[in-house]
Amino acid sequence: MSAEGAEPGPGSGSGPGPGPLCPEHGQALSWFCGSERRPVCAACAGLGGRCRGHRIRRAEERAEELRNKIVDQCERLQLQSAAITKYVADVLPGKNQRAVSMASAARELVIQRLSLVRSLCESEEQRLLEQVHGEEERAHQSILTQRVHWAEALQKLDTIRTGLVGMLTHLDDLQLIQKEQEIFERTEEAEGILDPQESEMLNFNEKCTRSPLLTQLWATAVLGSLSGTEDIRIDERTVSPFLQLSDDRKTLTFSTKKSKACADGPERFDHWPNALAATSFQNGLHAWMVNVQNSCAYKVGVASGHLPRKGSGSDCRLGHNAFSWVFSRYDQEFRFSHNGQHEPLGLLRGPAQLGVVLDLQVQELLFYEPASGTVLCAHHVSFPGPLFPVFAVADQTISIVR
């Protein structure tokens, strides 16, 4: 079947040879409708056809255009294949060799640095053990000296006492009166022997084991191994009405307006923006981290359960009483505070996270910045009773990280 007898369409000439026919007109599909993106016959493309006014071109022209596109695409694919082949042949072997070389160098670096750290730790261990031994020897020698001194004192007192008893039992009145000066001298000699007094020289000084290097390495190890094992959450009963507590009980947000939703109770702080954790510690080693990067006014530390909760006095204010030990920040001022004593800390910038290490075995509280590996401050004291992690925030938000 051919397009003969069909109404003339756009352009001139008859359609291509036999092939698929138009289902509507039975003519060869010799034209292409760009609007409908399909082949059409001359009748469809003519004045009365359905594609009148559309973008019409001959089918062979459209086919030639597609052939040219295919050729261009094949050339691009050939170039792409060549580039990939060259990359696989030339670049990847070098990358692989460089990766092997860099991995070997990285291993050497790790070994070198850990070897240096190990050597430094061994040297520090030896130095500290020698200091401990030296302090033990010093205390032991002081005790021996005291033993000798008091043995001599006892012997002298016994001699004086024996002499005085002899005078008392063997001398008559006149002889006793004649010995008055001797009695006075012996009594004065006895009075010159003082009673024993408590002396730190007789005690082992635990400060001999304190080392900035050891403390820093120890804090890093403790935070890395223990932080996260403590499931520290805030006790909602203690939260100040000026604070909002998150659903997971780990985030405190400061509010300038006092919340009316908080029911007052004996555990709740009613003035200062404080909160206690639900967990307390009486012994052992504990560590936790707090995200403080969003706040310029906060306090983090530990407090005794005896910390008062009511009123605006210093007895309820963290760091201003005998029941709380805290690291605090106000703008660019950093301090460690306890019982109204505030120790300034010379920090150039505020930590993003604050690590807290509580070692109740040796009665030590330590604050640490994980990002820089810096011990911000350490406090040694005999802590009374169970201790609770404690928090205060007067700007934005702080969160228990883990």
Curated annotation (Swiss-Prot):
Q: How does it sit in the membrane?
A: Peripheral membrane protein
**Annotated compartments:** Cytoplasm; Membrane
Question: Can you cite an annotated GO cellular component?
Answer: membrane
Recorded superkingdom: Eukaryota
Where does the record place the region Disordered? Answer: 1-20
State the Gene Ontology BP annotations: calcium ion transport; cellular response to leukemia inhibitory factor; innate immune response
Any one Gene Ontology molecular-function term assigned to this protein's record: zinc ion binding
Please name the InterPro entries in this protein's record: B30.2/SPRY, B30.2/SPRY_sf, Butyrophylin_SPRY, ConA-like_dom_sf, PRY, SPRY_dom, TRIM/RBCC
Segments forming B box-type zinc fingers: 17-65
Q: Where is the B30.2/SPRY domain positioned along the sequence?
A: 212-402
Q: Name one Pfam family in it.
A: PRY
Q: Keyword set for this entry?
A: Calcium, Calcium transport, Cytoplasm, Ion transport, Membrane, Metal-binding, Transport, Zinc, Zinc-finger
Q: Which CDD domains match?
A: Bbox2_BSPRY, SPRY_BSPRY
Function, please?
May regulate epithelial calcium transport by inhibiting TRPV5 activity.
Q: How does it assemble?
A: Interacts with TRPV5 and TRPV6. Interacts with YWHAZ/14-3-3 protein zeta.
Would you tell me the protein name for this molecule?
B box and SPRY domain-containing protein
**Species whose genome carries this gene:** Homo sapiens (Human)
